């Protein structure tokens, strides 16, 4: 039976976010299904035009999720029984747009959103432009750590490492995201406006994004 050593390496990586991700949600309710679709399409078109006026490409806005559902309200009838009545068709459209981190440009975007009749709910996230490159570096760090631990253990045990037999990696999704602003901070930020430039005075310096991942490597020993 082949002798083996199994070691789990931990990879650590700290990356500076370089991209703003704006996640926007628009929702509303209409009595008719077609009316709900029409209003959603109208609001989306308005939003795309707004970003186009700011120098973005309409294709930069990506849909994350869109659905229309029938909404009902529960109520108690005169006979004390509980029943449901139809309220309307509710649409929810979640979108995102990403652009290089730039407080001045972000301030202009937030100003336009704050003065738009559409007024979608939104949150600001910071991420990286090349997540795959960061994931590969993180994975390499984990393998390097596993090898260093295996070297220590094999030398202490008086054996030497052979060939790698297996490498086990979870392939879990790693989200490189920093959310430096909560809702209250965002509202305070948006109160500091600069009317002549039609932009909010945004001063955000997001912290580095710290991520950890593990890799388990099995070596033969001799």
Language-model region placement:
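Short, charge-dense linear interaction motifs
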Residues: 1-222
């Amino acid at each position: 039976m082949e002798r083996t050593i199994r070691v789990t390496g931990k990879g650590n990586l700290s990356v500076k976010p370089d991209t703003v991700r704006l996640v926007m949600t628009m929702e509303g309710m209409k009595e008719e299904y077609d009316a709900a679709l029409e209003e959603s399409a109208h609001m989306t078109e308005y939003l795309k035009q707004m970003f186009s006026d700011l120098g973005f490409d309409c294709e930069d806005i990506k849909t994350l999720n869109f659905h229309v559902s029938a909404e009902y309200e529960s109520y108690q009838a005169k006979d004390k029984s509980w029943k449901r009545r139809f309220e309307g068709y509710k649409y929810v459209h979640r979108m995102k747009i990403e652009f290089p981190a730039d407080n001045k440009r972000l301030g202009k975007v937030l100003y336009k959103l704050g003065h738009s009749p559409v007024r979608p709910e939104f949150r600001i996230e910071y991420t990286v432009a090349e997540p795959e490159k960061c994931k590969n570096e993180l994975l390499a760090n984990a393998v390097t750590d596993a090898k260093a631990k295996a070297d220590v253990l094999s030398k202490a045990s008086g054996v030497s490492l052979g060939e790698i037999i297996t490498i086990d990696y979870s392939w879990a999704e790693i989200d490189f995201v920093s959310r430096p602003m909560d809702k209250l901070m965002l509202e305070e930020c948006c109160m500091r406006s600069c009317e002549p430039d039609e932009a909010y005075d945004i001063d955000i310096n997001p912290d580095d994004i710290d991520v950890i991942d593990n890799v388990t490597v099995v070596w033969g020993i001799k």
